[in-house]
Amino acid sequence: MATTNNKNLTITEKVYVRVRLANEADISHIYKLFYQIHEYHNYTHLYKATESSLCDLLFKANPNPLFYGPSVLLLEVSPTPFENTKKDEKFKPVLKTFDLRATVEDKEAEEFKSKSCGDEKEDVFIAGYAFFYANYSCFYDKAGIYFESLYFRESYRKLGMGGLLFGTVASIAANNGFASVEGIVAVWNKKSYDFYVNMGVEIFDEFRYGKLVGDALQKYADKEKV
């Protein structure tokens, strides 16, 4: 059951979910979701992307084979069932139904209404994303997948959807010959930490994440090439 009022969406009992590969028509939503995750981590001052630069990164300037370049999976929700008729040569959408433990109140529904459904449904909304790309390591003789981030809008957290989205990326890796799925886990976020452990991720506490960026990186620039 669902109701809409003043651009808000209320869903009770069941929500229908689709995971699909993002495309250029989704760029405005991806930009907003990327901003929201920076907001969640108090890093908005570091968010330098624009819709145009993201589009170039993810689509126009991404000549890599599927899933080797920057890739985004979107998780869409709807109060009515999806039909299993969407034909996508690159990636077959994953469909699932969730029984809700609590009512979903989405005050951003109109802002995140999907523009790229590939069908005639008018009640499809983007709830979250997974961002990943291929990486390489001397430990393996094949590429792995670097899982950069997983994010859900506030209305769709704690509903069990994270497992579907992460599991879809893991299935992509397993089915396409990638050696691993790896990424960074925030040790301060116990729920996130426990989530990845429960998904089968092995945490290596003896390693620390390092980054060379900004002025520290520019010190290495060759002035003669500027």
UniProtKB/Swiss-Prot annotation:
Site (Important for catalytic activity): 157, 160, 162
Major subcellular site: cytoplasm
Region (Important in binding site and for catalytic activity): 29-45
EC numbers: 2.3.1.110
Known regulation of activity: Inhibited by (2-hydroxyphenyl)amino sulfinyl acetic acid 1,1-dimethylethyl ester, by DEPC and by N-ethylmaleimide.
InterPro entries: Acyl_CoA_acyltransferase, Diverse_Substrate_AcTransf, GNAT_dom
Single Gene Ontology MF annotation: tyramine N-feruloyltransferase activity
Keywords: Acyltransferase, Cytoplasm, Transferase
Domain of life: Eukaryota
Signal peptide stretch: none
Catalytic activity field: tyramine + (E)-feruloyl-CoA = N-[(E)-feruloyl]tyramine + CoA + H(+)
UniProt keyword Nuclease present: no
Gene3D superfamilies named in the record: 3.40.630.30
Localization annotation: Cytoplasm
Domain N-acetyltransferase: 72-222
GO CC aspect terms: cytoplasm
Entry similarity comment: Belongs to the acetyltransferase family.
Function: Synthesizes amides which are involved in stress response in the cell wall. Catalyzes the synthesis of hydroxycinnamic acid amides from hydroxycinnamoyl-CoA thioesters and various hydroxyphenylethylamines such as 4-coumaroyl-CoA and sinapoyl-CoA.
Quaternary structure (record): Homodimer.
Protein name: Tyramine N-feruloyltransferase 10/30
Gene encoding the protein: THT10
